[in-house]
A protein has these predicted regions:
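A short beta-loop-beta micro-motif enriched in histidine and acidic residues
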Residues: 38-42, 50-65, 81-84, 109-110
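Short beta-strand segments in beta-sandwich/barrel cores
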Residues: 41-46, 71-77, 121-122
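Glycine- and acidic-residue-biased ligand/ion/polar-headgroup-sensing regions
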Residues: 63-81, 89-92
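A generic structural signal for short hydrophobic patches within well-formed alpha-helices
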Residues: 73, 130-133, 248
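Cyclic-nucleotide recognition modules
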Residues: 86-149
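Polybasic "coupling" helices that flank or enter modular domains
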Residues: 141-208
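Phosphate-/nucleic-acid-contacting segments
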Residues: 179-265
Length: 265
C-alpha cells in the first residue's frame, strides 16, 4: 500500500508538471519522465515571508529548479532598496538563473533574496533532469531560453518606471501581462482579461511608491476603465483584474499632462 501511495504521488507530480507548467507542458511522453523514481520530484510548501534561498551567491548553484503549481506569488528583491525585481505565479518557474544549465552559467547578478510572498506550493525538479532535457529536447530548450528572456524583459519594464505614479504602476502591470501571456497562463477564455494576486505592498515595492499613492492610482485606473473593481471580501482583496491591457500602453507611455484622471499634477 505504501508503495502504491508513493507511486501515486509521483504520478501526480509528473501530471502536474506536464499539464500545469509552461516549461514541462506536454512532455509526459519523454522517456526521462517515465523513468523518474519515487524520490526524484519533491513537492514542497513554501510559507509566506520566509526566504527560499539567496540568489546569485558567488560560485554557488542550486540543486533544483522550482516550479510553482499553486499559491504565490514568489518574489525576488534587491538590497538595500528592497525593490521587487521578479514575480512568479503558478505555471512559471524560478531558480533557472542559479542552475548551471544553459544561460544560467552566465546570468549572474548581485545577491538577491528569493521568498514566497504568500504560501506557495512548488515541485522541485533536480538540476540533472533539467540538464538532460535541455540537451535532448529542442522544445524544452526553446522554452527554457524564453524564461531567461522574460526575466530580462520584466526588469526592463521596471527600469522604465518613472516617478510619475500612474506610469510606474502601468509599467508593472504591462510587465506582468507580457510575462503571463507569453507563458500561456493568461488570459483564460475568450476575454482578454488578466487576474493578478497583487497586494498593494507588492506594487509599492516593485514601483518604489508609497502605499497610499498606489491605492490612489489603482482607483484612478479602475475609474478610467483599465481595471475592474473586485469585491470587498478578504479572498479577493489583493486581486487586480486588468480588463484593458492594450489601453494600459497609453498610460505606460504617458507623461504628467496626458493622464487626465490623475489628480496630482
Amino acid at each position: 500500500m505504501a508503495r502504491q501511495t508513493e507511486q501515486s504521488l509521483r504520478s501526480a507530480a509528473v501530471k502536474t508538471l506536464t499539464t500545469g507548467s509552461f516549461l514541462f507542458h506536454g512532455l509526459e511522453q519523454e522517456p526521462l519522465f517515465q523513468a523518474l523514481d519515487d524520490q526524484t520530484l519533491v513537492t514542497e510548501k513554501l510559507y509566506s515571508n520566509r526566504p527560499v534561498y539567496t540568489a546569485f551567491r558567488p560560485q554557488t548553484w542550486l540543486e533544483h529548479l522550482y516550479v510553482v503549481v499553486d499559491g504565490g506569488p514568489v518574489i525576488m528583491r534587491s538590497t538595500p532598496l528592497d525593490r521587487v525585481t521578479a514575480i512568479t505565479y503558478p505555471g512559471g518557474c524560478f531558480g533557472m538563473r542559479n542552475l548551471s544549465v544553459g544561460f544560467g552559467t552566465v546570468a549572474r547578478a548581485f545577491p538577491s533574496l528569493v521568498e514566497a510572498y504568500k504560501t506557495t506550493d512548488v515541485i522541485k525538479v533536480p538540476g540533472a533532469v533539467v540538464q538532460t532535457l535541455y540537451e535532448q529536447n529542442a522544445e524544452f530548450r526553446h522554452r527554457y531560453a524564453l524564461l531567461f528572456e522574460l526575466r530580462e524583459k520584466f526588469q526592463y519594464h521596471l527600469l522604465n518606471c518613472s516617478t510619475y505614479p500612474p506610469q510606474a504602476v502601468a509599467a508593472l502591470l504591462r510587465a506582468l501581462v507580457y510575462q503571463e501571456r507569453n507563458l500561456g497562463s493568461q488570459p483564460k477564455g475568450p476575454k482578454t482579461e488578466y487576474w493578478f494576486d497583487l497586494p498593494i505592498d507588492l506594487i509599492a515595492r516593485a514601483c518604489q511608491l508609497n502605499h497610499r499613492t498606489v491605492e490612489q492610482v489603482l482607483k484612478g485606473l479602475t475609474k478610467a476603465g483599465y481595471l475592474k473593481p473586485n469585491k470587498a471580501s478578504d479572498s479577493t482583496h489583493d486581486l487586480v483584474q486588468v480588463v484593458d491591457p492594450e489601453g494600459l500602453k497609453a498610460v505606460y507611455g504617458a507623461t504628467r499632462d496626458k493622464v487626465s484622471w490623475w489628480p496630482l499634477k
